[in-house]
Every structure is written in C-alpha cells, then in structure tokens.
Amino acid sequence: MRRDSSETKRKILTVCVRLFLEQGYKSTSVSQIVDEAGVARGSYLNLFPTKDKILLELTETMFGGQFGVARSIADSKLPPVYAYAVETAIQLTLTELNENLREIYIEAYSQPDISEYIYLHTTAELKQIFGANFPDATESDFYEMEIGTAGLMRNYMARKCDIHFPMERKLSRFLTAAMRVYKVPEEEQARVLAFIQALDIKAIATEVMVKLFAMLEMKYDFKLSKNGETEEAR
C-alpha cells in the first residue's frame, strides 16, 4: 500500500509541476491533474487536500536549489549583503521573464503555510548576513523583519515592469527599502546598488531559470513543452 501511495504521489507531482510551469498555477484544475496523472480523484485528495499542498512542495524544491549561483557572482571577499542583493535581484527578475513563475511566487508568498516556510527558510540566512548590524537581535527579531521584507518582495514581484517602472527602478526601490530595514549604511547601499546595476541581471536570471527548469524536470521526471519556456530561454 505504501509503495502504491508513493507512486501515486510521484505521478501527481510530476503532472502538477509541469502544468504549473506550462500553463500557470490558477489555470491548473484538479480534474486536469487527475486525468493527466491517471489517478483517482479520491487518491489525489487523500494525498493533497488542496493545491497549495503541492505548491508548498514545489516551493521547497525551488528555494532549495535556485540561488546557488548568487554566491558565485557575489565574490566571497565581498560583504554578505552583496549575495543578498544578487539573490533578491535574481528572484525579482525571474518573475519578469516568466509569467507562470510570477504566479507561482506570488501564490507562495500569499498562502499562509507556504509564506511561513519562506519566513523560516530565510530567517537564519538574514541573521547570518545582517547580524552584525543587530548585535542583540535574536532569530525571532529577524523572523519578524522577514515578514516585512517578504511583503516588499511579494508586492514588487506582483507589479509588472513597464516603460514607467523599468526593471532597474524596481530593483533599486526594493533593495533600498530592504537594506534600510536591515540597517545597511547609506554608503554601503550605494556600492551594492552600483554592483547590481553593473551586472547583466537579465542574462543571469535567464541562466538561473533554465537551470531551475532542468532541475525540476530531472527531480519530477517530466519534459517541458516549448510553450512552457520563455523566449529568453530558447
């Protein structure tokens, strides 16, 4: 029975992740999932009572694997705030490259259980990066600050770039607001922003997206259709 349940879960996840990336989270119905996975609706609901349970699993995979490149871009000799800036700039840019990724991220930051995972996942990293600015702060303090900066991230991801609000402006606004929360000195903020502006962040984010999709294809054993890719990724 356990093997059957494990196989059913694998089939469901394979179909769900592919459909979320190809057509979007909200456009993927339970009926479509069970039809394409070839499983009974009852079996699906036993394993995943709601779609956001699947989204949580996908979010854990994405957050676990998408940002390794940031550490290599931000030289280890630089202060850790540079890695934070690269990571967040990549995430904001990813959502401009692919509307289905935008929807996945916004849903993840909006669902209580998933946003809680994000807060907890990020808190330890924030303490490591910005701890020197808050010598008496606890992990709880950084958790509470992350609730605020995660809200900034969600809202900046949701607002699409246009001629009046280009990507460069979005990155600058988000990073300035976040760095002020974490008490980064103004002079250091200016250096970090100049560093980010000197990067080809769109090319970097495109590379991250291609690697992310490849990792998800391998983990969940599926192949994205060409329609699931952005023009930049082809």
Q: What kind of region is each of these model predictions?
A:
Residues K11, L19-K53, E57:
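Helix-turn-helix
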Residues R41, M62-V69, L94-N98, R102, ...:
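A short secondary-structure junction motif
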Residues E57, G68-L101, Q111, Y119-T123:
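Hydrophobic alpha-helical connector segments
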Residues R102-E107, E187-R191:
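Short, hydrophobic secondary-structure boundary micro-motifs
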Residues Y109-C161, F165-T176:
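Amphipathic alpha-helical packing segments from all-alpha helical-bundle domains
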Residues Q128-A132, D162-R234:
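C-terminal peripheral helix-coil segments that are non-catalytic and often amphipathic
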